[in-house]
């Protein structure tokens, strides 16, 4: 299996992160899923062990990525998964269906929905709270795994598909991103995703 290595430097220290890596599996289908036309304005409500985060979507720059995420969420694909990779000051990564099984930790980070989607790299910068698609070395290898930026990793711009941003729940992001971890960037305590629901934006009390 192949994985992507990212070098993240801070001052004189350099740490090599595989945080955005998503391994290719032999059984994964490489055909692209058919995405339905974008629906009315909606947001995602990510219910976690630490509280709720609400994501607004950038359908103007990543329409197929947004619709794929919505499709999976509506199918309850993400329910019962967890944030399996956490790098404080960088990002939290989730969306792997294999994380539904606590006994499969050795394979965390390799799961997908059985298909890949094409990249929609765009000019939106990776700043705190931005949600983007994880992938392997192949630019068109994203499937279901995503990450939410804890820091401002602008070096990822135009290399990963940013498709939305938190509009509520920054405190929840902070709690998850600062939880104690052990190699390889696994949280000591499971950071579960109870559900991801897609709801009309006008049904939420947003700032």
PLM region descriptions:
Residues 2-9, 15-207:
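Cyclophilin-like peptidyl-prolyl cis-trans isomerases
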């Amino acid at each position: 299996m192949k994985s992507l290595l990212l070098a993240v430097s801070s001052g004189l220290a350099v740490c090599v992160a595989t945080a955005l890596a998503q391994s290719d599996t032999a059984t994964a289908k490489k055909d692209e899923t058919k995405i339905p036309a974008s629906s009315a304005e909606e947001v995602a409500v990510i219910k976690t062990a630490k509280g709720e985060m609400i994501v607004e979507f950038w359908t103007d720059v990543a329409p197929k990525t947004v619709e794929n995420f919505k499709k999976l969420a509506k199918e309850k694909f993400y329910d019962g998964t967890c944030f399996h990779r956490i790098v404080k000051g960088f990002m939290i990564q989730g969306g792997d269906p294999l994380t539904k099984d606590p006994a499969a930790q050795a394979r965390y980070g390799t799961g997908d929905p059985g298909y890949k989607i094409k990249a929609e790299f765009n000019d939106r910068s990776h700043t705190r709270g931005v949600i983007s698609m994880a992938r392997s070395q192949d630019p068109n290898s994203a499937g279901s795994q995503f990450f939410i930026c804890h820091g401002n990793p602008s070096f990822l711009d135009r290399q990963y598909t940013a498709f939305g941003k938190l509009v509520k729940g920054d405190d929840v992001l902070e709690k998850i991103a600062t939880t104690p971890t052990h190699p390889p960037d696994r949280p000591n305590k499971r950071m579960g995703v109870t559900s991801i629901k897609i709801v009309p934006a006008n049904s939420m009390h947003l700032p």
